[in-house]
Amino acid sequence: AQMSTQTGIDGVLIGAYSALNGVFGSRFEGPNHWVTGSVTGGEANKGTDPGDYSTINPIQRYENDPAAGDLNNLWRGRYEGVSRANKVLALLAGDASSGIQASIKTVMEGEAKMLRAHFYFDLVKHFKNIPVFDETVSAADVSTTKNTSDAAAWTLIESDLNFAYSNLPETQSQLGRVNKWAAASLLAKAYLYQQKYSEANTLFDAIIANGKTPAGAKYALLDNFAGIFNAENDNHAEAVFDVESSMNTGSTQNANYFDDLNYPYNTGQDGPGICCGFFQPSFQMA
């Protein structure tokens, strides 16, 4: 019965948002992807002690076993996010949403599609020929869905983001919910990854000229670069897509997931992350 109310379906949507920061407790599910991005890209090294989190080492050397746990957890976590977004969309398309105002349903659909596109974008960046399924695919067919290219993924990503860009509001009453300009920015990035430079340029021009944060602030550069990382500046004018977290819950260290290892080594009990000196700049970058 709860699933047939706006509050119930919104709770499922919030569950999809929660997958942004990981589901299965693996640090590789964190949204930063500094290992698969900066470390494999050459501008950073793992850092810390040689034996600490040694499963990162083969990833840096491009020797990772496809069956290794870290990347498998990234795969599982992102598909869990897809599944949660699909559940929202299935509920909105069914009888359960009949009592919800049409305009509210459209916004909820836009948020769910933006999230689904984000999860698929992460998957297509990390893996090849990923299976793609939307809210119409039955659970029985999910395990047999296959693909021989990334074309289907990009098609769905573009479709979802175009819908979100066209239907999401510029501002949101609850910070943390995505707005139309977050969708536009991710869509422009998707165009870049596909070498659709003309489409990306047109969209970036619109974002620069008109883009706003969900709080309504026009996109702008902060006066101090360090201010981007100051918690007191959450949802600042450079924040296009923020992943919100609770605080003072005692559930983890004082940092974004996986970034909590990257503070200076042995900063002590009162330090920002207690340890560990990961994610150090490489000589190549310097």
PLM region spans:
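Short coil/linker segments at helix-helix boundaries
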Residues: 105, 129-150
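Alpha-solenoid helical repeat scaffolds
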Residues: 122, 126-129, 135, 193
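An aromatic- and glycine-enriched ligand-binding surface/loop that stacks and positions planar moieties
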Residues: 1-52, 130, 162-165, 177-182, ...
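Conserved, well-structured interaction surfaces
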Residues: 6, 10-14, 18-24, 48-127, ...
